[in-house]
Amino acid sequence: MSLKNKIIGAIAGATLLGGGITSVVKHNEGYSESAYQDSAGVWTICYGETKGVKRGMRLTKSTCDTLLRKSIAEHAEALTGLPESLPDVVVLGSIDMTYNIGVYGFKNSTVKQLLMKKDYAAAERAVLAWRYITINGKKYNCAQYVNGKPNKVCWGLWERRQWQAKAIGNRYDSIESAVNALMKGQGI
């Protein structure tokens, strides 16, 4: 079975992996039934949905949950070609990263190339290179402190990357420990 089919089955069958993926994406993306512009100015709704979103859009929680399951399945496409034997925790981190940077971004990333070789330590380091965002043409380093404090522009993205790095680096014992670390803010 391919990783994509494993993920789709996990989401549909409410397995531990499926529940973990859903919990992580919901936690990291947040929820809004009304369209809003994210920190990069992209119109967003539900749990980070951007496709076809316009100002003034509103969707129900039920519709958002359906879109989330569909979107996770679409993002699983980026894991095509990875070894089917990847640990579930690595799959969890990879799906969350793909959900954030997009299918194209993950498919063409050094992270994916390293995971194809099962080099988890190098893949973990490569995740942390994804720490920049551009807003109105200005590039921000999300890992940077300003006046001794975490920056206010995108520190949350940096915290997400640190958690993803540990998951992709296979440094959690289980799906539960990875999800619990994230929920308790211990992913960083």
Predicted segments with their positions:
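Active-site nucleophile-His-acid catalytic modules used for acyl/amide transfer and hydrolysis
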Residues: 73-112
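Long, amphipathic alpha-helical surface segments
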Residues: 1-11, 19-40, 49, 53, ...
